Amino acid sequence: MSNNLTDLTVAEIRDGFRAGDFSAREVAEAFNANVAAAKALNAFIVETPDKALEAADAADKAKAAGEALKPLSSVPIGMKDLFCTEGVQTTAASHMLEEFKPTYESTVSKKLWDAGAGMLGKLNLDQFAMGSSNETSYFGNVISPWRRGGGDNAALAPGGSSGGSRRRFRRGCARRRRGPTR
């Protein structure tokens, strides 16, 4: 098992948290730090570090009280900005929805939060997920974390409508993503 919390798999996070190897807050803080450090790659349209910490604190509190833990307690995720999340800007990467804050949860997000997951933020994508290069987002292209022979990576696209998901996973910015992949 890695000493870096952001290198752990979902199962390793879950099991390590349950075994007391680390707290859920430590996991959320590590992922929040990676999200902040990788801001230049533009994978997240909206960052929600407080949501990740809130879910982590709830998991730590439940564990301390001896309560049954939820399946995804302590696991931080990036949510594709295609899914509505109550009170959090949801744009589908479109200018038309730039100010939209849903008053409800999508079925996908509700199930994840009910399972104990914490949201690190909303992941960038092609506008309305209608693309294959992740270059049509109103909020700008996602920059690939890979470098071409040690050179500039700005011209590289992570590809797929879920480019933010692909980029953030490679850079240790979230352990799971919710969005289609090709």
Model-assigned labels for residue ranges:
Residues 59-76:
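Immediate post-signal peptide segment of exported/extracytoplasmic ligand-binding proteins
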Residues 104-182:
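Short glycine/serine-rich loop segments
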Residues 31, 52, 80, 112, ...:
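Conserved hydrophobic/aromatic pocket- or pore-lining residues that grip, position, or stack substrates
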Residues 1-47, 51-54:
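An N-terminal boundary/leader segment
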Residues 38-39, 71-108, 132:
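Enzymes and membrane/adaptor proteins characterized by extended Gly/Ser/Thr/Asp/Glu-rich
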Residues 50-57, 116-117, 126:
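Long amphipathic alpha-helix in the N-terminal Rossmann-like dinucleotide-binding domain
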Residues 13-17, 62, 168:
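Hydrophobic side-chain positions on well-ordered alpha-helices
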